[in-house]
Amino acid sequence: MTATKQHKKVILVGDGAVGSSYAFALVNQGIAQELGIIEIPALFDKAVGDAEDLSHALAFTSPKKIYAATYADCADADLVVITAGAPQKPGETRLDLVGKNLAINKSIVTQVVESGFNGIFLVAANPVDVLTYSTWKFSGFPKERVIGSGTSLDSARFRQALADKIGVDARSVHAYIMGEHGDSEFAVWSHANVAGVQLEQWLQENRDIDEQGLVDLFISVRDAAYSIINKKGATYYGIAVALARITKAILDDENAVLPLSVYQEGQYGDVKDVFIGQPAIVGAHGIVRPVNIPLNDAELQKMQASAEQLKDIIDEAWKNPEFQEASKN
C-alpha cells in the first residue's frame, strides 16, 4: 500500500464477537473506505446482516462500502485482518487452541494468498503469536507484512490499571507488557513512567500503591481475559479497539510505536525465529522496525523464557507434515 492511496480497503476474516466488534469500531471511528467481511458458508447470512446493520451507522460517521465478501475480494485489499478461530473456553489457555486454530489459519491464509493479495496481514486469533508465525509461514510474505496484535491489549490493560491506581489519565501512563500474549507475558517495570516520571520515582513521591500492590496489579492484567471469559464467555471490545488502532496506524502511515507481535532475529539474545510481543514502529508498509527497549536482567530472562515456550509449541506443531508442506518461508 502506498502512503498516498486514498481508497483504503480492509477485508475482515471472521465475523464472530471479535470480528463484528472490530467492524463496528472501524465504522464508528471512520477508518477505511471499504470493508469486506468474510465468513464460512454456513454463516454467510450473518456477514450479510452485519454489513447491512453497520451500513445504517454510516450517516452518523463517514462514507464506507461495507459488504459480505469472498476470498476473491482480497486481491486488491490493503489489509486482511484475521479474527477467525475456535474461541477460548473457560479453563482453556490461549496455547490450548493451537491444534484447532492452526488448521483454520492454514485454510484462511492459503485462500487469501491465492486471490493475489499483496497487502498486510494483521492477526488477532489466538494463540496470536503462534498464528502470526504460521501466517508468515503459510503466506510466504516478508516478515514486515505479517503483524500480530501481540501485547497491544495487554499493554492497554496495564496502562489503565496503573492509571486507576494513581489517579491519572491512562493516556499519560507509558508502560508495556512484552512477551507472549498469554500466561508468560511480563511487565516492563523498568521503563514504566507517568508523563516522563519513572514509575518508581512517582510512587516514592505519591505512595499510591506498595510493592505487593504492583504484583497484584500485574496478575490482574495478565489474568484479565480469564476473569472476563468466566463472567461473559469471551473478550471482544478491548481487542476490537486495539485492532482498530493498529489498522489506523497502517492505513494512515503513522509510523506509530505500538506493542505488536513481531519477528525476532536476536534482538533479545537467543530469541530468534519466533513472533512475540514488543514495541515496534508500524506504518503503510507494515513493520518499519522493532523498538528494542533495553530490558534489565530479570526482564530479559522473562522475555527469553516466554519466547522459548512459544518456540517449543511452534516446533511441536511443525512436526505435522500438513503444516511443513504448506510452509513457504
From Swiss-Prot:
Annotated residues that bind beta-D-fructose 1,6-bisphosphate are located at R159, H174
What gene name does this entry carry?
ldh
What family is reported? Belongs to the LDH/MDH superfamily. LDH family.
Role played: Catalyzes the conversion of lactate to pyruvate.
State the species of origin: Streptococcus agalactiae serotype V (strain ATCC BAA-611 / 2603 V/R)
Q: Which CDD domains match?
A: HicDH_like (cd05291)
EC number(s) reported in the record:
1.1.1.27
Q: Which residues bind substrate?
A: Q88, R94, N126, P127, V128, D129, D154, S155, A156, R157, T235
User: Where does the UniProt annotation locate this protein?
Assistant: Cytoplasm
Q: What is this protein called?
A: L-lactate dehydrogenase
Could you tell me which pathway this protein works in? Fermentation; pyruvate fermentation to lactate; (S)-lactate from pyruvate: step 1/1
